[in-house]
A protein has these predicted regions:
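Flexible loop/turn segments at secondary-structure boundaries
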Residues: 100-102, 133-135, 248
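Proline-centric
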Residues: 1-6, 56, 148-159, 175, ...
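Sequence-specific dsDNA recognition surfaces
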Residues: 47-55, 64-82, 89-121, 144, ...
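Alpha-helical scaffold segments that mediate packing/assembly in large oligomeric complexes
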Residues: 21-41
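A short beta-sheet element
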Residues: 94-95, 113-172, 177-182, 187-192
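Secondary-structure transition motif
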Residues: 29, 35-36, 74-75, 157, ...
Length: 282
């Protein structure tokens, strides 16, 4: 069980590294496939100097900002939306949950919050205060707390494109803070507005990237779900094994039936609806 769990973690890390490598190849080195399927820049694709970015970018690209490709919806002050008697609460997603997932210390919020601040597996989250982190969420449904943005598409740009663009730009913010020998306190909407990134005029190249990366994201979420199920199984079985209540035979086999990853049809019962935006400016 431990080996299988660590194996899944290793696979997820490798998948993330491979996806990032492909992103860098296409959108940093600009060797995305040209019309003939050859690497654009390496095959002599025309590059144009951009004065704002201070670098050459492919012809037909421009300098834009993160708001052009993504929407940033801030979470709620969840302490103002505690669950009422009889409600089935949602766990609150704070920066701690982004690191550790849900724990016994995780707070709860009413399920009657706007859909825009409900989080589902596969959503992109960006903690913008104190700890600057971007992640593909895979710890289960929850309610988003303030100091974290839920990042969604703007102007039709796909998830994989705005995820890696944001991931790269967070590194820019961190390097700026390091150069000033200070800690970046938080990222505001103004910081995002002032960001500068290279964006293709025709988003078909971003859509082609999405076709390749979307299955990778789906597999990463599935593996994380399995990791969580195995972790829960470990935490609940170890005390039983230690005090002799179960043994590594048929007792354990029967218990395993109760700890499995939900199948696809069960996961589909939870639909990810998008509601009216309730974003709050940072």
């Amino acid at each position: 069980m431990y080996i299988y769990r660590m194996y899944n973690i290793s696979i997820n890390q490798n998948l993330e590294a491979l996806a990032k490598q492909l992103y860098d190849y296409w959108f940093v080195q600009f060797d995305f496939p040209n019309k003939e399927g050859k690497p654009y820049k390496s095959s002599g694709g025309k590059m144009v100097w951009n004065e704002v970015l201070k670098r050459n970018i492919p012809e037909g690209w421009h300098c834009g900002n993160l708001f052009e490709i993504a929407k940033f919806t801030n979470g709620l002050a969840c302490q103002k939306f505690r669950p009422k008697d009889g409600e089935t609460p949602l766990p609150v997603i704070k920066i701690r949950e982004m690191r550790d997932g849900f724990t016994a210390d995780t707070e709860e919020v009413t399920p009657n919050i706007p859909d825009a601040v409900k989080v589902f597996n596969g959503d992109i989250l960006f903690s913008w205060s104190a700890s600057l982190e971007v992640m593909l969420w895979a710890f289960g449904e929850g309610g988003l707390n303030q100091h974290i943005f839920k990042v969604t598409s703007a102007n039709g740009f796909p998830k994989s494109f705005y995820y890696y663009q944001l991931l790269d730009y967070v590194d820019v913010f961190k390097k700026m803070a390091e150069a000033r020998k200070t800690t970046m306190g938080h990222i505001t909407q103004d910081h995002l507005q002032q960001s500068t990134i290279a964006i293709p005029d025709d988003k078909k190249i971003a859509d082609e990237f999405e076709k390749r990366i979307s299955p990778v994201f789906e597999q990463m979420v599935k593996l994380q779900e399995e990791i969580l199920a195995l972790t829960k199984l470990r935490d609940e079985l170890l005390p039983l094994l230690m005090n002799g209540q179960v043994s590594l035979n048929s007792d354990l086999s029967s218990l395993l039936l109760y700890y499995r990853v939900p199948n696809k049809s069960e996961n589909n019962e939870r639909k990810h609806h998008s509601g009216n935006s309730c974003g709050h400016a940072a």
